[in-house]
Amino acid sequence: MRSARLVLAGILGASLLTGVSVGSASATSAPTLASCKTAIASQEISSGKLTVATDNPVYTPWFVNNKPSNGQGYESAFVYALANILGVAKTNVAWAYEPFDSSYTPGHKSFDFDINEISDTPDRAKVVTFSDSYYDVNQSIIALKGNKIVTMHSAADLKGYQFGDQIGTTGLTYINQYIKPTKPARVYSTLDQAVAALQSKQIDAIVVDTPTGQYMASSQIVDAKNNPLATQVGQFPSVGEHYSLLFQKGNALAACVNVGIAALKANGTLAAITKKWLGIYTSVPTLQP
């Protein structure tokens, strides 16, 4: 759904990376973990430094306490694991701010990559470069406990309700393409605005990725005594959506990042991070199409 970023800090800036070969490999050779470590440690790509950006605020379970640099939360932990396997020290990873809805616009990017629950979609891929998937996504419905929508369990049952969501998100796309409500979904500039509309009963429900939805229902939408006011109605079957790191179009670093992601999957690190930070979300019931 959203985004974060790493800014190149070497002699070659992010704007100069397009078309650069990785390490000693030629432009037609597939990079290896060893060649990528060499390329990143040298001045060929980033002189061993990466600057990462994400939105503000960021949410549990992707980040914790709105502090991307603490290594807590799925996306923060993943970034540092990725940096480590590519030979970048934790102290050489810097974080910066990038609004979600501007991350996937065309043009120069002042970061290495952006991580903020950004879904790899065909339209976005026309103007930016995406990494391989680091998380496969299900969308789910969040509603206030007293709303009748909480008893609905299929897309057909949901059509008569008022949905709302943040502009540019795949949650909003899911509402329009799969739920197809009879009332046009209301669109908000930020997710916080959509949540406020839900709390004030201007809308009946929001569609977000399952982990974000679980956090909203259990910890974000609460009363003065922190009792949950909302519930996660259920999650939809997968439609092939996944989250990827976002790069400036043609950024050569993406090839090395893909090598790193593959290595984290192969050695079990990504699975361990998933179990630690997202394990409880596998039990959310699935809604019928």
Language model: regions and residue ranges:
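Secretory targeting and sorting signals
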Residues: M1-A27
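Extended ligand-binding regions for polar small-molecule ligands
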Residues: A30-P31, S76-Y80, I85, T169, ...
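Extracytoplasmic small-molecule ligand-binding "clamshell" domains
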Residues: P31-D114
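Bilobed "Venus flytrap"/periplasmic-binding protein-like clamshell domains
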Residues: G71-I85, I118-D120, D136-V195, T210-Y215, ...
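Alpha-to-beta junction loops
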Residues: V88, H108-I118, Y161-Q162, S200-T212, ...
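Acidic, polar ligand-binding/catalytic clefts
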Residues: N92-D157
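A ligand-binding cleft/hinge motif common to bilobed small-molecule-binding domains
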Residues: S102, I118-K126, N176-Q177, D204-V239
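Periplasmic-binding protein-like
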Residues: D136-A143, S218-V259, I280-P289
